């Protein structure tokens, strides 16, 4: 997979395809074998997010060569005797950060023309709906147009939660006959997990008697950090328990963050780790925490929720999309989205949570979201070229 520094060993996407084909041929996949060989090019490559690493991890074993690309022109003209797929992920960079609608519409048209040409060349188009619209969408009409037109061209639309069709309806329609639903995986086996909860608290200088709420991941306006800080302070005023809030993640917009940072700096029991967290340190934040809070104002699927469960840490999240499905059988609490008091109540409820009981539930829940199982399931669907019956 062309998803990290190892990708440099393949000079081009075509080289990667040839190398992958040779590997599959040795495993009895190919034109002269009982098992068909396929190729899937995915766009764009997300190096900082292990989602793609996990989702494609079992593809070669299922006869599919996964190859990442950040330039569709590099793969558009490739011809292949087996099935070829273009797998689209996040669409935000197609329009980019322009605020000029004419420029945006031109970029949409150029992208769609490229997709049409790839379909003419034999590519099947797959789109994974990670979010309904980009969280920071400026030219919403252009973003909607892009998705409306892309849906028409898709052979497979991949959703990761059952709410996707309903939540999309206000902007665009998703035809059910194109949809396959395979959930977001946990991050099992990806992140190191050797340290104890006690060691993790020691590393982060957290006392054993503190009840710790965690906000983890990139700090962006739509994630509702302002709401969480307010809710934390409100709860702190209602209880005698020693509370602590850990905020760990990279800030995307410093000007938006300035106001809330003043509140954080003025609070002795809020700790801010304002950087991207190295993979080897991720475990410390979740193991030191009692519960992870995702106070998102906009959400569809949440990798952070699954990351939290990977370490056995319960989650609080809004009662929509992936959170609603993930937490329906335990492993945390949901609250009514955009309802501040309900967020406070969910956090208050967590103070008396039976954590041993919830961790047992999480272990059971994680079986459904095992990354090897998810990758194999998705690969089998792709091999069939259609919906999961």
Task: Mark where each language-model region is.
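Conserved donor-binding/catalytic core segment of Leloir-type glycosyltransferases
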Residues: 207-223, 229-232, 245-246
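Donor nucleotide-sugar binding/catalytic pocket of nucleotide-sugar-dependent glycosyltransferases
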Residues: 152-192
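Acidic anion/phosphate-binding donor-loop and adjacent secondary structure
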Residues: 169, 186-203, 209, 385-386
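Acidic donor-binding loop of glycosyltransferase active sites
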Residues: 284-300, 310-313
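Short acidic/histidine- and often glycine-rich active-site loop of Leloir-type glycosyltransferases
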Residues: 306-307, 320-329, 333-334
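A charged, aromatic-enriched C-terminal amphipathic alpha-helix characteristic of glycosyltransferases
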Residues: 355-384
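Conserved acidic donor-binding segment of nucleotide-sugar-dependent glycosyltransferases
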Residues: 329, 333-341, 347-354
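Nucleotide-activated donor-binding/catalytic signature segment of Leloir-type glycosyltransferases, i.e.
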Residues: 249, 257-283
């Amino acid at each position: 997979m062309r998803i990290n520094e190892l990708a440099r060993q393949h000079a081009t996407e075509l080289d990667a395809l040839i190398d992958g084909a040779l590997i599959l041929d040795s495993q009895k996949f190919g034109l002269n074998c009982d098992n068909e060989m396929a190729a899937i090019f995915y766009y764009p490559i997300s190096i900082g997010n292990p989602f793609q690493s996990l989702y494609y991890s079992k593809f070669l074993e299922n006869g599919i060569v996964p190859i990442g690309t950040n330039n569709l022109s590099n793969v558009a003209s490739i011809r292949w005797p087996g099935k070829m797929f273009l797998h689209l992920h996040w669409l935000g960079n197609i329009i980019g950060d322009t605020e000029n609608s004419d420029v945006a519409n031109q970029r949409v048209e150029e992208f769609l023309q490229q997709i049409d040409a790839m379909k003419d060349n034999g590519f099947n188009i797959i789109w994974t709906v990670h979010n309904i619209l980009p969280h920071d969408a400026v030219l919403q009409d252009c973003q909607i147009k892009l998705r409306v037109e892309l849906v028409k061209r898709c052979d497979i639309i991949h959703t990761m939660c059952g709410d996707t069709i309903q939540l999309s309806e206000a902007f665009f329609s998703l035809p059910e006959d194109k949809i396959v639903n395979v959930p977001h995986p946990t991050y099992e086996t990806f992140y190191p997990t050797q340290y104890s909860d006690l060691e993790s608290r020691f590393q982060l200088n957290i006392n054993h008697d503190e009840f710790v709420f965690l906000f983890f991941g990139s700090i962006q306006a739509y994630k509702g950090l302002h709401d969480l800080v307010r809710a934390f302070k409100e709860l702190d005023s209602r209880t005698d328990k020693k509370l602590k809030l850990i905020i760990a993640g990279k800030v995307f917009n410093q000007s938006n963050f300035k106001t809330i940072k003043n509140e954080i700096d003025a609070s002795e029991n809020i700790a801010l780790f304002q950087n991207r967290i190295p993979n080897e340190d991720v475990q410390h934040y979740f193991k030191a925490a009692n519960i992870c809070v995702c106070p998102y104002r906009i959400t569809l699927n949440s990798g952070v929720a699954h990351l939290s469960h990977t370490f056995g840490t319960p989650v609080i999240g809004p009662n929509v999309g992936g959170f609603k499905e993930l937490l329906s059988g335990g492993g945390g609490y949901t609250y009514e989205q955009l309802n501040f008091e309900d967020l406070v109540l969910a956090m208050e409820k967590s103070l008396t949570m039976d954590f041993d009981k919830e961790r047992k539930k999480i272990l059971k829940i994680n079986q459904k979201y095992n990354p090897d199982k998810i990758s194999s399931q998705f690969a089998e669907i792709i091999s069939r070229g259609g919906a999961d019956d």
